[in-house]
């Protein structure tokens, strides 16, 4: 079984790629909101989410409410906490385990994210997940899609090749070992100095 595992992962990656492609093939009818929609995509556990909050508040300054509507697409596990915070206008919960299935749930959620009509989609997670955050970046259909270049702890070369092509920008990362708080600050610094704001 160990011999076949790398090949099974490749097959699985392509199957998800095809499933998502078909789900997003149907013409969408995205909302046309008066404010530019900015998606913040985080699918990680509550510990990483809580550590990110110190940086999260800075996104309100980068994308002020008179011009932008911030929607957090987040893990359902911390939805109740996130919706009480003033850093975003809406929280869009994702049931992570169910999302990583070939299901009506995944199909519908991809369509809902596409229909938000986002202009900007941002995934600040350092260790990106092909089936989760990267798939949601792709589904957003945003003109500007930004993630951390990150590491490959959750991705093989095929997943990295496919997912990187779904982005317009990848924020470079230091090769030095950094804490989660330092990684969050590093990403935001790279994003906020971007010429595309």
Where are these regions (language model features)?
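Catalytic machinery of carbohydrate-active enzymes
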Residues: 1-197
